[in-house]
């Protein structure tokens, strides 16, 4: 875990994670803060040699579970290409893993305004490009 932030108000709590490999720190943070209304986690630009700094999509969903997330917004997957996977692969794997456990998720397009306190949405915008 390189850096992360918890933003908390009287009504809501958000976790913003930076680049991170999957490990026990997510469960520790989830235990400390009980739950998060939204977690923003990296998913993309992964490779076996980068496992300590970038999670694969299924690990991102597992981290969201460990954090007791009510909604997941996976980021770090659609703007730059550093890894050899197709650029849309991370989000499609996120969707599959999140839907398997009924975890609400967002798939906002770059530059799109996200109203995260509303119902989560999973528009497949990349398929329309």
Q: Model-found features: residue ranges?
A:
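Cap/insert and terminal regions of metallo-dependent hydrolase folds
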Residues: 13, 21-110
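Core dinuclear metal-dependent hydrolase active-site scaffold
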Residues: 1-34, 110-129
